Curated annotation (Swiss-Prot):
Signal sequence residues: none
Pathway it works in: tRNA modification; N(7)-methylguanine-tRNA biosynthesis
Protein name: tRNA (guanine-N(7)-)-methyltransferase non-catalytic subunit trm82
Tree of life domain: Eukaryota
Species of origin: Aspergillus clavatus (strain ATCC 1007 / CBS 513.65 / DSM 816 / NCTC 3887 / NRRL 1 / QM 1276 / 107)
Gene Ontology biological process terms from the UniProt entry: tRNA (guanine-N7)-methylation
Amino acid sequence: MAATFQYPFQCIKSVERRNSGRQLIIGSAGPKIYTYAAETGERLGIWPETANTAEAKAAPSTTGEEPPEKRRKVSPPPDQKPEDSEPASQKSRKPEASPAWSTIPILAVSADGEYVVAVTAEDKCIRVFEVEENGALKQLSERQMPKRPSAIALADDDRTILCGDKFGDVYSLPLIDTGKGSVAPRAPAKVRPDQPAATTLTVHSKRNLASLEQQLRHYGQKDKNSAEEKPSSTFEHHLLLGHVSMLTDLICVSIPMDSSSEKKRSYILTADRDEHIRVSRGPSQAHIIENYCLGHTSFVNSLCIPQWAPEYLVSGGGDNYLLVWRWNEGRIVQKVPLVDETSDSEVAVRGIWVTDKMVLVAIDGSAKLLCFTLESDGTMKAQNSIQASGNVLDLTISSKDSAVLVSVDAVHVAGSTQEWRATPSSSSTLIEAFRLKSDTENVEWEPMSEAITSQVNSQGTSEISATLEEKQKKELNDALYSSGNLRKKNLGEDE
């Protein structure tokens, strides 16, 4: 049997359902989304649901390796035998229909824990799911955006999706699809004759006949293009703002309008590939630009505002440092180095997260999770880092015990975004848990043996063949580690 890896979790989220008090862990690995009980690690659901998933619901101990149940046939060939007449061993070897996407690079969760928003990459769809009582995901809508989404966030009302795309635009969409279109009516076209007034009876010279023939071909092609014109989007969405380059991250935040007022004003902070961070007002006034935070020299792809100190912003991207801002003033508070100043190695920040007055930073292709404390004056101090067993892909903070759950890449060699491990391990490590040591004065982390980690790691996700062709390996490399592609190439004078 060929050796196989397991798809690592590209995104992982901790979900606390306010209505029921139940805590879940949701992660996307390859083309699927998995949900788990946070306390026990029991797998509660897989989306999209397969025959194996349905069987697993009937028998919780099933790991998905047994023959699938009978499935509805879709357009079988005329000479294909009925499915019931085939041996079970042949049924189990039948490949399942592949979805139209290979990865789910973005997940977001509503504050009440009732809804999950996901982006499926290749089909450019934003999908909204309801988290059911049993922990499974029920898809409520799928909306194909004009351009591929590159960042999403939920607005302060928790019922509006903000979507940034690769062309720099930011749209707002209702969380629950209204079914109403929002495309502005087109201006009436100028009345023009459908065909030239001249005919072969009125044109006689060879040159004029050739010109007439060309005009007729032009009008015929125009009619064809009009007939083939794609229909407009039928779901409600509104353009809020735009950048002149690819939008890489966005967040929404509300702060008091002044020190003596309880009234708050919402803002949208957006980052792009051209080193810019833009501060705009909330969705209703997004056309108003408050200021820019300018100071990066490479792309910016990660923005983070601490909940306990919303006046500060931590940003990172292709520079070998982070910047701490007083974002409503556009003022840099501190420049925080990520590597030794003498190092010429390129750095790509993968993500920035906050927990317990601390800031955690992941670097693309690194198994080390950098840790900083955020002081009251907005400065950050480096602390002991977290060492994972593989490259850090994502993390989430458990609301139950503030444990840091880290998604680990068990496919690539630690420290590399291109080199695959020689052989898969007998049991893949998909997530690891860490917590702060309570009996030390300094900030120190220790690994935790949690039910959630052991259960998730033992159940695995989908399999990846260790003998994939180089082209397929490169596709997975690019899907997991895309930050480096944002870096602009320095072309020499002779190029």
